[in-house]
Amino acid sequence: MMQRCWRLPVPLGKRGLAVVTHTRQAVVSDNPEAENLDGFEQQYLKERIEITTFQRMLLGAGSSIAAILDPRRHDMIACLGETTGEDALWNIMDTMHESEEGQRIMVEKPRIHTSTIDFKRLESLPADTFGAAYVKFLKDNKVTPDSRMAVRFLEDPKLAYLMTRYRECHDLIHTVLDMPTNMLGEVAVKWVEALNTGLPMCYGGAVFGAVRLRPKQRRAYLKHYLPWALENGKQMKPLMPVYWEERWEQNVNELRAELGIKLLNKF
């Protein structure tokens, strides 16, 4: 288990009170520990927005209210994840170091977007492979892996990578669960992610997203989607340590069986 280092609180007299006031740590070379950081971590420290504890509390409260009022505000949901998810991310970090696959992810820090994935190759794979299923999911739902917001408010660069990884793997989780991106599918996936990762933002998205379902959707949610999501979320293996990029050629149903995933019966 990694040793966790906590920063001493900033004296109250030195804390800014305006949320809009922030500073960026732009010079990594001045940090004596920078030599031990990899490329992702050094770049993150250049772009990270530093905020005080008070500002973090305000951002967490404000983003949670905005996300409840309008679940389509992905910027607010992203902000909520960064300002409330640190403890859960440390737990995920422990999980990553419990497997060889997770350890390699933390060392290599792979990224998922159109400049890193050979989508033409994935399109050429047999239809029953995970890679082909992923490409089909993107096309069917008209989504792109380049749409994820960058992490900015987490202090620890390793935790920032974990949050980045979670965001970039979201569509892969949709794929392996065979869930679309409509409201029902998103709420169901959020329940699975919440139970699997412990991230508060996932619980929030699952609970408050369900409130906005229409009557017909809510009946299907309570009868089919919610029981299925709770069962899978509790029984499946941790998803964050899965090196998805090494599973493109794997049979998608074999991958589901390996992870302990049961698909929702179509009705």
UniProtKB/Swiss-Prot annotation:
Enzyme class name: lyase
Main location: mitochondrion
Cell compartment(s), UniProt: Mitochondrion inner membrane
GO-annotated cellular components: extrinsic component of mitochondrial inner membrane
A biological-process GO annotation: ubiquinone biosynthetic process
Membrane topology, from the record: Peripheral membrane protein
Cofactor: Zn(2+)
UniProt keyword list: Lyase, Membrane, Metal-binding, Mitochondrion, Mitochondrion inner membrane, Ubiquinone biosynthesis, Zinc
Residue positions binding Zn(2+): 170-171, 174, 186
Catalytic activity: a 4-hydroxy-3-methoxy-5-(all-trans-polyprenyl)benzoate + H(+) = a 2-methoxy-6-(all-trans-polyprenyl)phenol + CO2
Pfam families from the UniProt entry: Coq4
Enzyme Commission no: 4.1.1.130
Pathway given in the UniProt record: Cofactor biosynthesis; ubiquinone biosynthesis
Record-stated family: Belongs to the COQ4 family.
Protein's job: Lyase that catalyzes the C1-decarboxylation of 4-hydroxy-3-methoxy-5-(all-trans-polyprenyl)benzoic acid into 2-methoxy-6-(all-trans-polyprenyl)phenol during ubiquinone biosynthesis.
Note from the entry: This protein may be expected to contain an N-terminal transit peptide but none has been predicted.
Known partners and oligomeric status: Component of a multi-subunit COQ enzyme complex.
Protein name: Ubiquinone biosynthesis protein COQ4 homolog, mitochondrial
Natural source organism: Drosophila pseudoobscura pseudoobscura
